Amino acid sequence: MIDSEGFRPNVGIILANDNGQVLWAKRIGHNAWQFPQGGIHFGETPEQALYRELREEVGLLPEHVQIIAQTKGWLRYRLPHRYIRPDSDPVCIGQKQKWFLLKLTASTRHIQLNLSDPPEFDEWQWVSYWYPLGQVVNFKRDVYRKAMMELCMLLPQQQTFEKSSL
């Protein structure tokens, strides 16, 4: 599903633990790390897509997490030209994302990367909240910054993070 401007609707997921760290996952077959994310299917709400992607990519169910916040609007990024397929119909030029901040309420033993075929990720780790900004691929960096800035303000009071490397 691609909108009239060429953007694919998508959800981004920032999953935090009790220590204020976030789940950071490595794409299978690549040396690229990112937050879990995925497309919104036709007829699906962003929240429904969030739970489907969470299950497919990291094995978590709705009862394993709590939604803390979501971005007010859609955040967009354009794909580099090398990733655009001009012969597809319609042509996708980027993604528009609704971001969610979640808190893990279950044990990490519920995190499973092998539930989809093929799996999206082959490794994961907990990292400090702002760490991903310096690590994510360049074309996603601005969206990550905007989502993280908006959502960090909505974290529970006991969660504090240093905004280093912004």
UniProtKB/Swiss-Prot annotation:
- Entry's Pfam families? NUDIX
Q: Please name every pair of cysteines joined by a disulfide bond in this record.
A: none
Q: Which cofactor does it need?
A: a divalent metal cation
Report the top EC class in one word. hydrolase
- InterPro entries, A to Z: Nudix_hydrolase, NUDIX_hydrolase-like_dom_sf, NUDIX_hydrolase_CS, NUDIX_hydrolase_dom, RppH
Please tell me which stretches of this chain the record labels as motif Nudix box.
Answer: 38-59
Q: What is its EC number?
A: 3.6.1.-
Functionally, this protein is described as follows: Accelerates the degradation of transcripts by removing pyrophosphate from the 5'-end of triphosphorylated RNA, leading to a more labile monophosphorylated state that can stimulate subsequent ribonuclease cleavage.
Please give the HAMAP family that the UniProt record associates with this protein.
Answer: Nudix_RppH
Please report which protein family the annotation says this sequence is part of.
Answer: Belongs to the Nudix hydrolase family. RppH subfamily.
Under NCBIfam families, the record lists: PRK00714.1-1 (NF001934), PRK00714.1-4 (NF001937), PRK00714.1-5 (NF001938)
Q: What is this protein's name?
A: RNA pyrophosphohydrolase
Q: Which organism is it from?
A: Acinetobacter baylyi (strain ATCC 33305 / BD413 / ADP1)
This chain is encoded by the gene named rppH
